[in-house]
């Protein structure tokens, strides 16, 4: 049962991060296409947003380890 809980935690964390990263990058590309002169600022904000979204799978892995070994 612990193995299933760990797999679900990691899977949902990765799924959410993948969807979030896709949305962030697609909106950034749309913004750069509309205003190419704002590309540098948009790219910086994109990487900050991706870093925040990628924190969730890391937390999911920690929760999975706690569920598996705890």
UniProtKB/Swiss-Prot annotation:
UniProt cross-references to SUPFAM superfamilies, sorted A to Z: F1F0 ATP synthase subunit C
Membrane topology field: Multi-pass membrane protein
Keywords, sorted A to Z: ATP synthesis, Cell membrane, CF(0), Hydrogen ion transport, Ion transport, Lipid-binding, Membrane, Transmembrane, Transmembrane helix, Transport
Annotated transmembrane regions: 4-24, 49-69
Gene Ontology cellular-component terms listed: plasma membrane; proton-transporting ATP synthase complex; proton-transporting two-sector ATPase complex, proton-transporting domain
Alphabetical list of CDD domains matching this protein: ATP-synt_Fo_c_ATPE
Site features described as Reversibly protonated during proton transport, chain residue numbers: 54
GO biological process: proton motive force-driven ATP synthesis
One function term, GO molecular function aspect: proton-transporting ATP synthase activity, rotational mechanism
Compartments where found: Cell membrane
Domain of life: Bacteria
Classification via NCBIfam families: ATP_synt_c, PRK06876.1
Similarity-based family: Belongs to the ATPase C chain family.
Function: F(1)F(0) ATP synthase produces ATP from ADP in the presence of a proton or sodium gradient. F-type ATPases consist of two structural domains, F(1) containing the extramembraneous catalytic core and F(0) containing the membrane proton channel, linked together by a central stalk and a peripheral stalk. During catalysis, ATP synthesis in the catalytic domain of F(1) is coupled via a rotary mechanism of the central stalk subunits to proton translocation. Key component of the F(0) channel; it plays a direct role in translocation across the membrane. A homomeric c-ring of between 10-14 subunits forms the central stalk rotor element with the F(1) delta and epsilon subunits.
Subunit structure: F-type ATPases have 2 components, F(1) - the catalytic core - and F(0) - the membrane proton channel. F(1) has five subunits: alpha(3), beta(3), gamma(1), delta(1), epsilon(1). F(0) has three main subunits: a(1), b(2) and c(10-14). The alpha and beta chains form an alternating ring which encloses part of the gamma chain. F(1) is attached to F(0) by a central stalk formed by the gamma and epsilon chains, while a peripheral stalk is formed by the delta and b chains. The F(1)F(0) complex interacts with SpoIIIJ and YqjG; YqgA is found in the same complex.
Protein name in the entry: ATP synthase subunit c
């Amino acid at each position: 049962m612990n193995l299933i809980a760990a797999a679900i935690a990691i899977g949902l964390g990765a799924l959410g991060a993948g969807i979030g990263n896709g949305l962030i990058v697609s909106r950034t590309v749309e913004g750069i296409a509309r205003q190419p002169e704002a590309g540098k600022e948009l790219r910086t904000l994109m990487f900050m947003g991706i870093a925040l979204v990628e924190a969730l799978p890391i937390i999911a892995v920690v929760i999975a380890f706690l569920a598996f070994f705890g």
